[in-house]
Amino acid sequence: MPKRTDIHKIMVIGSGPIIIGQAAEFDYSGTQACLALKEEGYETVLVNSNPATIMTDKGIADHVYIEPLTVAALTRILRQEAPDVLLPTLGGQIGLNLAVALSKTGILDELGIELLGTKLASIDQAEDREKFKELMQELGEPVPASLTVSTVEQALAFAKTVGYPVIVRPAFTMGGTGGGLANNEAELAEIAKNGLELSPATQCLIEKSIAGYKEIEFEVMRDAADNTMVVCCMENFDPVGIHTGDSIVFAPSQTLADREYQRLRDCALKLISALKIEGGCNVQLALDPNSYDYNVIEVNPRVSRSSALASKATGYPIAKLAAKIAVGLTLDEIKNPVTKTTYAEFEPALDYVVVKIPRWPFDKFTKADRRLGSQMKATGEVMAIGRTAEEALLKAVASLEIDQKDLLSKEAAAASDRQLEDKLVHAQDDRLFYIAEAFRRGYSLADLHELTRINHYFLDIVAGLVEEEGRIKAAGLDKEVIYEAKRDGFADTTLATLLGQNPAAIRAFRKANGIVPVYKMVDTCAAEFDSATPYFYSTYETENESRRSAKPSVLVIGSGPIRIGQGVEFDYATVHCVRALQKLGYEAIVINSNPETVSTDFSVSDKLYFEPLTLENVLNVTDLEQPVGAIVQFGGQTAINLASGLEANGVKILGTTVADLDAAEDRELFDQVIKDLNLRQPIGMTATTRQGVLDAAKEIGYPVLVRPSYVLGGKAMEIVYGQAELEDYLNQNADVTGSHPILVDAYLEGAECEVDAICDGERVLLPGIMEHIEHAGVHSGDSMAVYPPQSLSGAVKVQIEEATKKLAVALKCVGIMNIQFIIHDGQAYVLEVNPRASRTVPFLSKVTGIEMAQLATKVILGHSLAEQGYRSGLAPESQMIHVKAPVFSFSKLGDVDSYLGPEMKSTGEVMGSDTTYEKALYKAFAGAGMEVPDNGAVLLTIEDNDKAQILPLAKRFLAIGYRILATSGTAAFLEENGLHPTVVAKLHEQGQPAILDVIKDKHVDLVINTMGHDDEKNSDGFIIRQTAIEHHVPLLTALDTVNALLRSLEMTSFKTTEL
């Protein structure tokens, strides 16, 4: 069936900001789809609120709108652009929910706009829990005993009839949002209440738990002619009960007998046909490990996290082909872009094993609830490819970029047997390492299966690797044993630990004995057909399939898994670096480990190596490719941390040298540069002992900002107000040594701002200055920011410009750098310098029109700013106002304090742009999901330090028609100043109304809580904030953000004043 000619203009809905459950995979799939539609000759319109994406670059679609993903904003764009069709299945759950909401408003019927790909009825049938269950019964497909409920009482009554445990699955949500496993009545009441509040349809499925079954996923495709095919079958290491986004996943499936596979495959294809889905779809099934019985868990009628993983695991570009199917093409008409000879209807075949491990944020959130269940908690994931399951598993662990590089865990080794068993029964993010430790202690396969319900096959893989550790220790540096260990995925660092050597000695021994990796191609067909994919993974075999090109090449080091502090912004910069290299005639080689991103789309670079970002793996690639050099400026701290090891092994670091990178990161060297240039910075000291930290704080005077050197995302950074608090900080971050010093700075009050600068060694270009809306002390990644600045004087801008120029030249920056300033008493103080691309690159590139990463790449390769047509200094400011707002995922992470401070907590960002600051703010708040009505009620719980500031804000709330509720101390202060708030009883006070009831019963529309820096779980401020998050009441903890919100609300409200 040829493509449709009755449609010309297609509008695509993007997925919005990165949150837990919906990450960079949608940037990858949306970018692929937009380009595929353009390739077919259609005019495309894209709407997305996330500026940190390749998808929102000019040129990916014909018309790009960075606007809030709300019904109101989309309706305006639909009227303006009048597309023929709307494609919602590439925008994750947000895209689907918006399609349903737009349809209900009648705008699609009014404008005659058709839904492309999957029809509304199919979306509804797959997402509405009751309709889906009815369809399964019609098809004769088994589902767990369940009931769709719209009240907590119905949930409790059903659970009584089927017995506990039960699983709660809210309708129309993603990442298991609001769901969970309930073991008793109290747990069910709490989870069901939360799930009903979070479901757009106020609907939950209560399901008899089948926890312990094998969890199997099929990625399937279907076209309009009802051709269906399986792209990939994946099997979870963890049994049913843990969200698939929080599970280790193997592809292809490892433990299914042929009969089981065929039954489940038939079921998956039957479902996609019955739902009439056109495009890609994810089917989740549960298989009883003791029989052939299975249950259908759910169907996602859209591209998803799993489809991005399946695309990278197989090389089969699901989103690209789903977009082509949506416009009428069939699987037997579309050429497979990998082989270029076979058609898309051929099912991929794998002659390797892929392992995905989630990347959790618990290294940032040390007090978070780490237990895993049916609600997803991971921010990102890594993928590794090997010839065997063992090799792929160990490579995936090495890719995580956590303190744990292999299965040798110090924490697990130190646990008592009782603690160990508790960790095995109650799954957390680190359970794999405790399984390995249990085998070291002599636990049997049967013991561990009983404790974990994990399949014997997967446990046997871990047991085999633990046995091999023993053989390696016993044999010493033996050529045969080392070769076998490398084939099984053991890293040089692990072998060094086991043998009491250093990794360099292991590498030297390997090379001397010819134990070096070869690279195999990912070709979708297990080498059955000719293929020329430039997509490789390493293994220890004989034939090498990667050939060095005669063209000069440059290696670009990616940024690894998405995590808090290092998000999709760095992947954006990596992709632009690749584009610039290709324009300059170089072969661009990417090494990365993240399956969700655009940079690991093999069609982006000239060569892609899917490998852990460790020194060993990067050096193996440079040994083979012999690049001109490596670029580390765009891969975040991951790439910067590899620079000195690469240089020590003879790899040229292009751009700013390693010595100059160190000068910016090393406190004493940097302080000397500041002094030499006569610039201002807050008083600061470096301490290498616990007592040294305490002495430094005393000398500088409290409050002080304390942090370790060499960190990203403000990890372990805190504002400390007194000695007792500082001692608590040191107890939690006790690793203070000469190689791990602690920095102690005076904490200055003032406005923060930052610049990204590009320097060619002589000239320095500042594309723009971004002013932070929150006060100093809130991490720059969590602060709202505005460009151009709204309150900086001309004189301050000149100070910033001059300081940036001096620093860039003095630090011998060649490429890109980021500098943060604080404006205190009209003077600009330098806070910190990052000699690399920062998370602001995509935002500033979009709003200034200067493609910063491309410009910096050309500078790195010797093309001066003058040559590229740029002058030194601050670029002219734009006429439009642009506001960047952070987006958080607190509702997914229990026990994480939402109080904003110097440690970064946001997972994503949105942008609002308009002709005035107030309108841009309004859009940014709308994009971030801060839905506050024009009038209502606001609850104030304010720390004493902030009371003077709250008074004018409270008066402004009254002026626009808000009622004010406040706790006793805040209320007394407001009364003294002529305002009459309603007093609410604090947590430990008698009286009505009680503060938590006011929040739980939604008697307030906004909570403003600045009850500070004490983040102990039982502190009043923490409990109030958690209650607001759990009940989805908008919450603000910084008064500067409140001021910004008021400005946006005041813009939409009319004053009523008497004559």
From Swiss-Prot:
Please name the GO terms of the biological process aspect recorded for this protein, alphabetically.
'de novo' UMP biosynthetic process; glutamine metabolic process; L-arginine biosynthetic process
Ligand binding (Mn(2+) 1): Q284, E298
Domain MGS-like residues, every copy: 930-1059
Q: Which UniProt keywords apply?
A: Amino-acid biosynthesis, Arginine biosynthesis, ATP-binding, Ligase, Magnesium, Manganese, Metal-binding, Nucleotide-binding, Pyrimidine biosynthesis, Repeat
Q: Where does Mn(2+) 3 bind?
A: Q820, E832
Location of the region described as Oligomerization domain in the Swiss-Prot/TrEMBL record: 402-546
Name the positions where Mg(2+) 3 binds.
Answer: Q820, E832
> What are the GO MF terms of this UniProt record?
ATP binding; carbamoyl-phosphate synthase (ammonia) activity; carbamoyl-phosphate synthase (glutamine-hydrolyzing) activity; metal ion binding
Provide one Gene Ontology cellular component. Answer: cytoplasm
PROSITE patterns according to UniProt: ATP_GRASP, CPSASE_1, CPSASE_2, MGS
What Enzyme Commission number(s) apply to this enzyme?
Answer: 6.3.4.16, 6.3.5.5
Q: Which residues are in the ATP-grasp domain?
A: 133-327, 671-861
**Where along the chain is Mn(2+) 4 bound?**
E832, N834
The annotated subunit structure for this chain is: Composed of two chains; the small (or glutamine) chain promotes the hydrolysis of glutamine to ammonia, which is used by the large (or ammonia) chain to synthesize carbamoyl phosphate. Tetramer of heterodimers (alpha,beta)4.
Recorded hits in HAMAP family, A to Z, give: CPSase_L_chain_A, CPSase_L_chain_B
The name on file for this protein is Carbamoyl phosphate synthase large chain
Q: Which organism is it from?
A: Limosilactobacillus fermentum (strain NBRC 3956 / LMG 18251)
Its lineage opens with: Bacteria, Bacillati, Bacillota, Bacilli, Lactobacillales
